[in-house]
């Protein structure tokens, strides 16, 4: 990636025939600190190749669940199904973008500014997530 890539998606580990959504231990191990460590490693390799760190745009993979209700029980249940003890813990994980449209917008912006992630591949967790994302979140980034 450091030698050739223009975009790199840093995603949770997969293994044993399961993705992060179905592998609670892997989901819980992939923390913001682990993500930052992976980005730091990429930056080290870019430095070794004499490429600017900004030459590789970063993307991620996340489960997205949006609700108009703060602390929505459905989102709480999704967080627990992923292995988190509560919604707040899931919201602080790089594998999830969950909450109200304003919360998700703020988290995408925070991750963009603080971590450098510009793109996401998302898995939509609820039927209403797509509509809320298209109507209330996406326009803020266009």
Predicted regions located by residue number:
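Active-site-adjacent structural elements that line small-molecule/cofactor binding pockets in enzymes
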Residues: 1-142
């Amino acid at each position: 990636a450091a030698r050739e890539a223009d975009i790199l998606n840093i995603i949770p580990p997969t293994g044993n025939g399961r993705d992060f959504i179905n592998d609670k231990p892997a989901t819980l191990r992939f923390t913001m600190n682990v993500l930052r460590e992976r980005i730091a490693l990429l930056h080290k390799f870019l430095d070794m190749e004499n490429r600017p760190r900004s030459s590789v745009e970063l993307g991620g993979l996340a489960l997205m669940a949006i609700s108009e209700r703060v602390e929505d029980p459905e989102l709480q249940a999704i967080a627990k199904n992923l292995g988190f003890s509560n919604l707040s813990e899931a919201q602080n994980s790089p594998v999830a973008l969950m909450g109200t449209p304003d919360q998700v917008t703020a988290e995408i912006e925070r991750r963009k500014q603080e971590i450098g992630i510009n793109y996401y591949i998302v898995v939509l967790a609820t039927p209403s997530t797509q509509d809320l994302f298209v109507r209330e979140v996406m326009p803020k980034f266009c």
